[in-house]
Amino acid sequence: MADIIILFDENLTGLVLSIHYFALSIIHIFNIVLIILIKINKMRILFAFLFFIGIYCTADAIVIDSTSYISTNVSEGYFTLSDSNGSTPLLTSSSDYAGVIRAIEDLQKDIFKVTGRRPELKIDTIPASSKVIIAGTLGKSILIDTLVKKQAIDTTGLTGKWEKFILQTVKDPIPGIESAVIIIGSDKRGTIYGIYDLSEQIGVSPWYWWADVPFQKKDEIYIIPGTYTDGEPAVKYRGIFINDEAPALRNWAKEKFGGFNHKFYENVFELLLRNRANYLWPAMWIPTMFNEDDPLNPKVADEYGIVMSTSHHEPMMRSHNEWYRFNGGEWNYETNKDKLLEFWRGGIERMGNYESVVTVGMRGDGDEAMTEETAVDLLKHIISKQRKIIADVTGKPAQETPQVWAVYKEVQDYYDKGMRVDDDIIILFCDDNWGNLRILPKKEDLDHKTGYGIYYHFDYVGAPVSYRWLNTTQIERVWEQMNLAYEHGVKDLWLVNVGDIKPMELPISFFMDFAWNPDAIQANDLPNYYVSWAKQQFGDYHAKEIAELLSLYTKYNARRTPEMLKPDTYSLKNFREAYRVVEEFKQLLEKSTNIYDQLPESHKSAFYQLVHSPIEMCCNLNEMLVAAGKNKLYGEQGRASANLYAEKVKELFFKDAELTRKFHEDLEDGKWNHMMSQTHIGYTTWNHPRTNKMPAVSYIHTDTSALLGYMVEHGLEPAWHGFSVEGQGCFSPSFIDFDPINQQSYYLEIFNRGDKTLDYSVKAKNDWIQLSKNEGSIQYDEKVYVSIDWDKAPIGKTTGEIAITGAGKEYIVKVPVRNDLPKASGFIENNGVVSFEAANYTNKIDTKDIHWIVVPNLGRTHSSIIVEPVNSVRQKPDNSSPRVEYEFTVFDSGELTVEAFLSPTQDFKKHDGLKYAIAIDDEEPQIINMNEGEIIPDYKYAEWWTKVVADHIKIKKSKHKADKPGKHTLKIWMIDPGIVFQKFVIDAGGQRRSYLGAPESNYVEP
């Protein structure tokens, strides 16, 4: 009886059934039902095979796409990688690439670190063992090519592929070898990726060195028989840009390696390969020069298998800093052409045969525009001269040398005005430096032969304020924007600015995983990505809990970068916003601390670096800034606690320094010294301050006796700031309405304005007013919570009173109650505001071709919604077109203002803006252009742009009418794809200032 192998190509678009071996003996007869579910051309087909004859298997089914082929439990037919008898030897050929031999040496070390048993590594010599692991490159390794000629291995679907590997188990490949696991690469990196895939599957994280992730120890390791591949990458070039590297990375590299030399870069190259990246823009801040600082840098890069290039303003494989060493004079082609051409020729000559992608084009000196106006003809002429140099030096047509043109900042103006480059040059589009794509190719441009790329940012130095300290990137936004790019045909180069590499570990992993196979990570897979990543770093220890920490701390940081936070960013007066933000971080820190305390010692360093430290640092920062906000507000109110918060700010400011010291000195015996040295407190311009500067605080003189003050939550404000202080001549403040549907609980804050202890009492003058306490003694301040007993409250509108007494004074606070509301369902108005998250729609209408999906966790407060496919054509809003609906209740008729909270997506179509339609009930839909007024481009730091990237949100307003109190329906129609809806806030006359917008309203089922 023959074994049946099921073969799928890497795109899961074909099915081949082939006969592989005849069974050697019949063991027994049994029934097996095999159901295979595959995806072909986006259709699911179910194939069922019923076998009635049991067999002895000599090979198993091929498994595709990141399937685990490792087991720690032995089973019949499994290949032993390591057990108590030792680790299986490794074998490779000296004829293979140096990078492949180096990678298999890494595998040898990895197996030893995981199992404690070092496998023997043989080069060209067959080990004295019945089993062996072989690695080699098709067409390069004599060993592999010999096995192919003898038909001992099957390389179907491998020849001519880009970076593809196959890992397969075979019987009797070599005389004396009974079985082998063979890793075959279609090219150098294909083999290397296959080797590192095995390392990762046995429990070695790509971040084992860069984040001290522990090796996941195993006593026994077995490989499940079969043939495995991850196919070809979806994106050809996938890489990082080490940028903005001073002071942190530069000082660290100088201390640990003597600078950005090949010893430093060896760690970078290995990290890239273990993450299946292949492309690098190296560090380039003054005075760094990749090729000149250490002549071994490019040689080692090529040996490892890294494709080198240079940044958007460094053409022809030359660091811009070399121009100063070269003494080239003015960086101006019109006045200094000969010097520039000579300079560029030197870059191509030095490049030699090293695998590279040559940046072409020209920008101004120091990351600036080349000319004041858009000089299309000049730039086209420059590129033609550069391509002539490439052809002359290499001795082959320019199109045979990979090239890229970076459409960055002002260069996009050239593209927008019709400039195009030769068909063999990759066109690298860019985001706006803040993670928002600026332009994508139109369908008619997709025939550009070498395709398109994206240059993305996790780090940036520039307006409105640099962000460099910690990870502020949500992988959900990366997914949404890069999925947009991929579906618009951008598949040839994905590059991301990662700053100092640390602490961008999580988004780097995601960026590379997504670039390899975007189809494998859909929106609903994003929550599990955090879990998988946590497992990769920490095993099964609290993986789900760690995933939650990762998803939330990045969400909180993405609301506003730490460098841009101010004492008044979050409201101290409305919606308890500032308090909620601090409490959210404190809850994260508490959970993180609990996990840290439970982890094995071997895992604590990595957990501290990847999870705990950024949470602790950002928790401290947010608490400090809110404390500074309290100091200012409480000082204005004359509170004694103003001085307390001045001291609190100082305490937390110095704690920030201590946390930095701890990271530098205590962690791994100082391994990461300097890595957290980026200043992050006290920005007054776009550029970082020389040193962290504590937020300004003030101290007040308090009375020598006790003095009573008070403040009501959400207080109406005829009085100064909504509170009453003796001698101010203020009106008695009032709460906003209480109602039986929302059943609010608001606080009354009693505070002391003197040095002595204040005794106070609070008394409700109506029996339906409930107080959390009636009296107290305070040195500073205390909250008394007010609610209503609705069984006793009178019907209709009425106002009760609370009397506050203390220090010989009595004050009256009004308590308005509204107990005459209409029947309510949907999201319920609360004092003139209705708020709901976009993902919490009450109804959605999809069409055959277009549907709404939720992107979990994307956004500042909850999740977001988008339409798919993201490259759909524009729709006309009507009763049958895609829309979402939200039921809500308002208590009065009148004008409503709807605020749509949108991710700050740019008009990447460069047409007339991205549009949606909106209506309440049966209104005629209003067409809203989310990009209206965006005339001045972002690179000129337009006001519209600086605000939306600072806030990480764009709010679009529209006016509507509620013709009656009661239930209504908000309708949102898709017109253009690409718009990300985060939340909606309806102002029915009670909107109050806050950064995040009103929290979601209560929802009542119909």
Where are the regions a protein language model picked out?
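C-terminal non-catalytic alpha-helical accessory regions
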Residues: 66, 216-218, 530-684, 873-874, ...
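Extracytoplasmic
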Residues: 719-721, 727-736, 741-1006
